[in-house]
């Protein structure tokens, strides 16, 4: 079953600021996650226990998403450089209950 991709409004702004190259890299990984969003190794903890991450190692970027199994939605809540965990702090503020 394939999930539907949604963006938090602030995450969409962050997405649009990315270079086309980074967008393409994330698109490729997101396409796989839409088929199987619950990747154990990518699961976050603490305040973000309902979220998962996608990492672009060389670029140093992170994408944090939340999964709603009832509605079959993968919601991108934040993305950006890992710089001092700012992307994770943004994700904490934007999570849906």
At which residue positions do the language-model features occur?
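A short, surface-exposed loop/turn module that caps and links secondary-structure elements
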Residues: 31-56
């Amino acid at each position: 079953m394939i999930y539907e991709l949604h963006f938090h409004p602030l995450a969409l702004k962050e997405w649009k600021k990315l270079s086309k190259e980074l967008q393409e890299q994330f698109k490729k990984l997101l396409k796989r996650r839409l088929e199987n969003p619950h990747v154990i190794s990518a699961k976050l903890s603490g305040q973000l226990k309902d979220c998962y991450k996608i990492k672009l190692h060389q670029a140093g970027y992170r994408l944090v998403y939340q999964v709603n199994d009832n509605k079959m939605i993968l919601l991108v809540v934040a993305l950006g450089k890992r710089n001092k965990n700012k992307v994770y702090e943004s994700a904490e503020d934007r999570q849906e209950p």
